[in-house]
A protein has these predicted regions:
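Hydrophobic helical h-region of N-terminal Sec-dependent signal peptides
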Residues: 6-10
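N-terminal signal peptide c-region/cleavage motif recognized by signal peptidases
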Residues: 12-15
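Short, aromatic-enriched amphipathic alpha-helices that serve as compact interaction elements
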Residues: 20-38
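Short, solvent-exposed secondary-structure junction/capping segments
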Residues: 32-66
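Surface-exposed, charged secondary-structure patches
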Residues: 54-114
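Hydrophobic/aromatic beta-strand elements that line small-molecule binding cavities or substrate pockets
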Residues: 89-92, 120-127
Length: 155
């Protein structure tokens, strides 16, 4: 009987874990599908964030009222101007069962006539038991943590 219960527990838990994308794949999809997560109303994005980071996005949205808030640049770029060139590479820097740091390395193009600079942004992901990855923090190419910036006292 105990063996049967153990097998049933593995079967019921197995598909949920198997259905979760790998951390780098999750980060790539988040980048592609939710690039402006930092600038719009937070409600549509909350399902992809931890409750803690979601609360900070809500706080920042309330503070900024749809205008520039604590960030005066695109956090993916680490700049106001320019664009992300190709190729964009996602790789896991550290990973444990409940946390991962994924780096996004890309050529930053400010002026097409000049060689691009290498920029790296980091997505800090968390996973709770029986859940998939969620964004817990975002570190800009400048090294600024959105969690830290968004939790700053309002001026």
């Amino acid at each position: 009987m105990k063996l049967l219960l153990a097998v049933l527990a593995l079967i019921s838990a197995g598909p949920a874990a198997a259905d979760c994308p790998k951390a780098a794949d999750w980060a790539r999809a988040f980048y592609s599908e939710h690039y402006f997560f930092y600038g719009g109303a937070p409600d549509p994005i909350l399902q992809f964030t931890t409750p803690e980071f979601g609360a900070l996005l809500k706080k920042e949205w309330a503070y900024s009222k749809g205008e520039a808030g604590h960030m005066d640049y695109d956090p993916w770029l680490g700049a106001q101007d320019g664009e992300i060139g190709k190729p964009v590479r996602f790789s896991v820097e550290t990973e444990s069962p409940d946390m991962a740091v994924v780096s996004m390395l890309y050529p930053y193009v400010l002026d097409p006539k000049r060689p691009p600079e290498r920029h790296t942004a980091h997505l800090v992901l968390r996973k709770r038991e029986h859940e998939c990855w969620h964004l817990h923090d975002f570190i800009t190419p400048l090294g600024e943590s959105l969690s830290y910036v968004y939790s700053a006292a309002q001026p």
